[in-house]
Amino acid sequence: LKGWALMGLGRVGDALELFDIASEKKGMRSFALYQKALAFCLVGDFESAEVIFSETDKTGTGITFRGSLVRAKILMQLERKSDAIDFLQEFHGEDAGQEVRALIAQLQAGAAIDFDMVRSGSEGAGEVLFGLAIALQNGEGHDGLLLYTRLASYLAPSNVHALLLSAQLLEELGNYGLAIAAYDAVPRSHPAFVSAELGRAQALSQFGKTEMSIEVLMQLVESFPALRRIHETLGDLLRQEGQYERAVRSYDIAIDMINQSRPKHWYIYYARGSAHDRLDNWELGLRDFEFALSLSPNQFQVLNYLGYSLVERGERLEEALSMIERAVAAQPKAGYIIDSLGWAQFRLGYYSDAVVNMERAVELMATDPVVNNHLGDVYWAVGRKTEARFQW
């Protein structure tokens, strides 16, 4: 922050020296050098800024989503349009959001793109606070992070990403009304509008306004039909609301947009498979579950769902048991998966093992009626009928 205060006073050399000193501290190198690169941009030295980014790129660390936009705009100032496009496409891949797609389209059209990521010492200070919030997301409490993002927005009002992070933090704190208002503050004309609307739809759903949430997503589908993430998000919401046929249609559209299936795509096949299953289209669901496992063989959600479903159907029981055991190994404290294991053991006649695991599942999920009912069935099978009646 002091470095950016010095930048605001025009003491560029002193500021750069401070950023260098900060970069030598443990765990601060990438963060401090990013600030130094932005400082170079503020004074128009894009060559020096790109030197920092190119070195960071070699190490494979330190470039964030916002940092990727910064670098692309630096390359544009250096009249390296092709390099900017190649970098964005490689960094974001086929799952690039509307903000990145819009920038690539501008680059391909030859539009003049100014460097507008940092335009003053104040905005640079806002970048520091926003960067700290990003870096500390998995450690510090959301209240503290929200202070950083709100201050970042105050110092750098044009930093829409700080506003989006504030909305996300408010949502995670359960302040859905404030989160919706924050998402709604992103201008429709801004390339990040789609991300904001996706966030608003999720917040509306959690706020109990499901129909409004679906309407927001339907409008996005109409306006941005080529964005796979919108169709997948709509599919998830429709599936959660029990509208399985509509969910499958949304998932179908999203899957058709995948050029090459990769491990990260396991979820959408799993989600479509569960929707097929709820529609009693088991063969279609099974195909999706097995394909999801081919993409990510140790994905515990798929292993548990498929294993439990096979047990319920009385099919491939030993294989189903093996799947659930692998899921438990990945998530040893997940009560619902331990319940699946105990139930599979019960169905296979391994009653002693079933009792141990069902009791453990009830410890973890004491109020769940299905788990308690399963334990009752297991107790009955081993002759503990009084305890079984109590569980039922």
Label the predicted regions.
Residues 1, 35, 70, 103, ...:
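Canonical tetratricopeptide repeat
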Residues 32, 67, 100-101, 128, ...:
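TPR alpha-solenoid repeat register
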Residues 4, 38, 73, 134, ...:
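Residue-level recognition of tetratricopeptide repeat
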Residues 24-26, 58-60, 93-94, 155, ...:
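Structural marker of alpha-solenoid helical repeat scaffolds
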